[in-house]
Amino acid sequence: MGCGKTTIGKLVSKRTGMPLLDMDALIEEQVGKKISQIFAEQGEAHFRALETALLRYLVEHPQTPPPVISTGGGVVLRPENRELLRTLGFVVWLNVSPHSLMHRNIRAANRPLLQTENPADTLHRLWEERSPLYRETAHRILNTSRTEVGEVCRCVCNLAERFFSHQ
């Protein structure tokens, strides 16, 4: 949620020539609704089920070349999703401090989980809840709180190259 997954995903895709698969954008396209609408009308559990269905599809129908996948921040909440992500390939956690996340999301009306009385507390709670799950899922962790996006892209590409060269 605001760590740069989509931005970095686009840059890594461009640099590597691998296609970008933005899960949130694909779900919006398939359902014909914005993520915020899905949350409001059908709830978070329904949205998480859509994420799981998409990940299952990707595992069952591998693409060549494999895509760079940008996920939603809560994709790791389901154990099955964590397993599916690792099955799909190299997982990088773009770790950002709660303070930096709040600064990046301060005006984000499109973040349904932050539409609360105290978005800072909500964001901190989500970070505390999700961090161990990100850590469990990721092959590598990059702290991106104070790192320029081009440098993050370069690091992700280098880490992925090393990962895939050892498989």
What residues fall within each predicted segment?
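Post-Walker A helix-loop "phosphate-sensing" segment adjacent to the P-loop in P-loop NTPases
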Residues: K14-A25
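Walker A/P-loop
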Residues: T6
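NTP-dependent small-molecule kinase module
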Residues: L11, R15, F90, E128-Q167
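ATP-dependent small-molecule kinase phosphotransfer cores
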Residues: M23-R86, R111, H124
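ATP-binding Walker
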Residues: C3
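A glycine- and Lys/Arg-enriched "phosphate-lid" helix/loop adjacent to the NTP-binding pocket
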Residues: L88-P132
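Short glycine-rich anion-binding loops that position phosphate/pyrophosphate groups of nucleotides
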Residues: G72-V75, S97-H99, T147
